[in-house]
A protein has these predicted regions:
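Charged, compositionally biased interaction regions
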Residues: 1-222
Length: 222
């Protein structure tokens, strides 16, 4: 269907169509408002948009987000994770998964074939996304969607003087309140993969599967 204020065609069943004009050379104060970092920003001069018309389908759904909370972060992390996965795979083909659990942070799971691939994965992430500041790389036997397992790998498979890489004076996000006034930031990566090989770290201490099968929670719960 045709717009209300122009000849532009838009989907007839769109949830909502907002027709507006961007006013050239005009600025006004915007804010304060929250950001994905979890901090609130003050006022800033921003462009002005004048809304000319709003139309919507019957029973339209308008989706809003709670700024800096999970629904806000999820919108951006999905495409970021896909981009980082491609970047790591070009350097470490045996990458298993990538997760962005928090602002400026990335977890990577790899099946390490040769020494040094953990560090290669770190550099791939930091080089692929300006916003990335902290990278943790673990072996494929560690679930990167479980923060407790990631911290366990850091505690038991990482020696700080050997396995932490720090890059100074790199460009980062201006939304990071810890960034230096000149816009530079330090970035760091943690190689929490097993060294010299995963074989030296197995078997992991786990309750045998046959024991779990013999346990019936009904015997212990009222």
């Amino acid at each position: 269907v045709k717009c209300e204020t122009s000849d532009l065609l838009v989907p007839a069943h769109a949830e909502m169509v907002i027709e507006a004009e961007i006013l050239p050379r005009q600025r006004t104060a915007e804010g304060p408002f929250g950001e994905f970092t979890g901090y609130s920003l003050g006022e800033r001069q921003r462009e002005v948009v004048k809304v000319r018309a709003i139309t919507h389908r019957k029973g339209a759904i308008f989706q809003d987000i709670s700024v800096s909370h999970l629904d806000h972060l999820l919108l951006s992390t999905i495409p970021i994770e896909a981009n980082l996965y491609r970047a790591v795979r070009s350097m470490v083909p045996s990458v298993k998964a990538v997760r962005v659990p928090a602002p400026f942070t990335c977890y990577v799971s790899i099946e390490q074939r040769v020494p040094g691939q953990g560090k290669n994965a770190i550099l791939a992430v930091l080089g692929a996304d300006l916003y990335m500041k902290r990278v943790v790389v673990v072996d494929h036997d560690v679930d990167i969607f479980n923060d407790r397992q990631v911290n366990w790998a850091i505690a038991t498979r990482c020696q700080p003087d050997r396995d932490i890489t720090i890059i100074t004076n790199a460009r980062g996000s201006d939304l990071d309140p810890s960034t230096k006034e000149d816009g530079y930031t330090a970035k760091w990566g943690v190689d929490a993969t097993a060294k010299p090989s995963l074989a030296a770290y197995v078997p992991r201490n786990q309750i045998p599967a046959k024991v779990w099968k013999r346990i019936n929670l009904k015997d212990f719960l009222p």
